[in-house]
Every structure is written in structure tokens, then in C-alpha cells.
Regions:
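Amphipathic alpha-helical polymerization modules
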Residues: 1-278
Length: 278
């Protein structure tokens, strides 16, 4: 009975966490460059994997199947294994604002170890040192003329320098070249991650590497193609309809576990009362 309580509890916790992830995605459906989080729920994996290849588990000798093998004891319950960002391209939104710039995904190599496709990001100077990365191209000019993001982080060029322009009358070409009065002043910095699942997602649509090292420039990567579009923003890649469906599914699963928990509670109450009468 207590094992059943544990199973129900883990189910409720996992579904509650999944609900929180989905609602956060929906809340950021209109946030430029936002990458939706995806959760993975696993059940009894540890004991199952440990049993693979274990020849010491007894098998019913009456079964005429020489290659059959039992998996042994199975751990009950589920848990939310991991939460990963979906780095698929969001739709483009025209803003007619010079400082709004969208990154356009092209072709990226596949990481052989993880099977994930690579991803590109704008380079930002983090105030605590190192770099931060974002897909939100909703930039502005600070009082000194530097191109910054909504948090005031400096947008970096491909050479790692801050980008300064005299006013918002500048042009960004399809290859990222920033020009003022037909004079090239910089090239927008873009970094590439072969396995973006290893990046740490921060607040405000920012990403950083786990160890604080800087990602390599996307311009120097073989097989990486991309472009830029000024006066546009990349919208979030949240699928609102799917998110609503997933939210209802998670809620129903939580509700089902809750009813099972109530049934266990009544059974235990009955057992205690009957034992008390003995």
C-alpha cells in the first residue's frame, strides 16, 4: 500500500512540474525569441537498465524459451527527468523598427553524440564577465549610441567588440554587416552551439554555457548557414494550441492521481479503524 502511495505522489509531483513548464511557455507566447521548454517524464528506468544483461535473475524453468530473461524487480513511480529548450525557428514579425533584427536559420550540422541539431545566437556582453546569448533581436540604442538588448547588455560584433552607431539610421544587410551612410562599421556577432541542450537557460531569453566559456563564432563553422533581417523580430516558437492541449492532459493526469490518493486514504482510514476494534 505504501508503495502505491509513493507511486501516486511521484505522479502528482511530475504532473505539477509539467503544468508549471507549460504555463510558463504560454505566458511567453508573445515574447520575441522565446524558446519553449520541453519536459521528459520517465518511469522505473534505473532498475530496468541495471537489470539489462544481468544473468543472475531466476527464470521459470517450466517456460520452454532458452533465451528468455526476467527484468527482476521494477521501481514504481515517475519523475520529470529533464527540461530542454526547443530551439526551432520562430515565426518572423515585421516591426518596421530599425533596431529590431531577426536571425534566420539556415543549415546546421547534427551533433553525432546527442543527435541534436546545432543552433545560433546573437552575442551579448554579460555584465558579470564572459558572454550571454539570445535569439531576441529587440535591440535599442543606449544614450552613448551602443546597441544593447532590453537588459542593457551590449550587443557584440563578430570580433567581440561593442557596436556603436551615431543614430538609428543604420542598415543591417543579409550577411550581418552594419553600415552607416554606406560605410561598414561592424558585423553582428553570431555564435554557434553544436549541442544547444548543454546551454543553461537564464531569465529574459538568455543562454550561457555551463562552464562560462564562450561559444565559437558561427561565421567560422563549416556547414553553418544563416542570415539576418532588419525591421523584423523572431517570435516565440510556442505552439499555443498544443500547449493548451498538453495543459489539459497534465491537469487530468494530476486529477486522476489525486483521486487514487483519496482512495488510498480511505482504505488506510478503514484499516486503522478496524484494527482498533480488535
Amino acid at each position: 500500500m505504501f508503495k502505491g502511495l509513493y507511486t501516486v505522489a511521484t505522479g502528482m509531483i511530475a504532473q505539477q512540474r509539467k503544468t508549471e513548464i507549460i504555463t510558463n511557455n504560454m505566458a511567453n507566447a508573445n515574447t520575441p525569441g522565446f524558446k519553449a521548454d520541453q519536459s521528459t517524464i520517465r518511469s522505473f528506468p534505473d532498475m530496468l537498465l541495471s537489470a539489462v544483461g544481468n544473468t543472475n535473475i531466476p527464470v521459470d524453468k517450466k517456460i520452454n524459451a532458452p533465451f528468455i530473461q526476467e527484468i527482476g524487480a521494477v521501481n514504481t513511480g515517475i519523475y520529470l527527468q529533464e527540461t530542454l529548450a526547443n530551439h526551432a525557428q520562430g515565426s518572423l514579425i515585421e516591426t518596421n523598427k530599425t533596431t529590431d533584427i531577426a536571425l534566420i536559420d539556415g543549415l546546421f550540422p547534427i551533433d553525432e553524440e546527442s543527435g541534436n541539431s546545432g543552433a545560433i545566437f546573437f552575442r551579448l556582453e554579460h555584465p558579470d564577465g564572459g558572454e550571454a546569448y539570445t535569439r531576441n533581436g529587440n535591440f535599442t540604442l543606449d544614450p552613448e549610441g551602443y546597441l544593447v538588448n532590453g537588459n542593457g547588455y551590449y550587443v557584440l560584433s563578430d570580433t567581440g567588440e561593442r557596436i556603436i552607431v551615431p543614430n538609428d539610421n543604420f542598415v543591417v544587410s543579409g550577411d550581418g554587416t552594419v553600415s552607416v551612410d554606406d560605410v561598414e562599421v561592424a558585423t553582428l556577432g553570431v555564435s554557434f552551439s553544436l549541442n544547444p541542450a548543454l546551454l543553461v537557460k537564464q531569465d529574459n531569453g538568455l543562454f550561457q554555457t555551463v562552464d562560462g566559456t564562450n561559444l565559437a563564432s558561427a561565421f567560422n563553422q563549416e556547414g553553418v548557414t544563416f542570415g539576418f533581417k532588419q525591421n523584423f523580430l523572431e517570435g516565440s516558437n510556442v505552439d499555443s494550441a498544443k500547449s493548451m492541449t498538453d495543459l489539459l492532459t497534465a491537469y487530468r493526469a494530476f486529477e486522476a492521481n489525486q483521486k487514487v490518493l483519496q482512495a488510498y486514504d480511505k482504505s488506510m482510514e478503514k484499516a486503522v479503524n478496524e484494527i482498533g476494534r480488535v
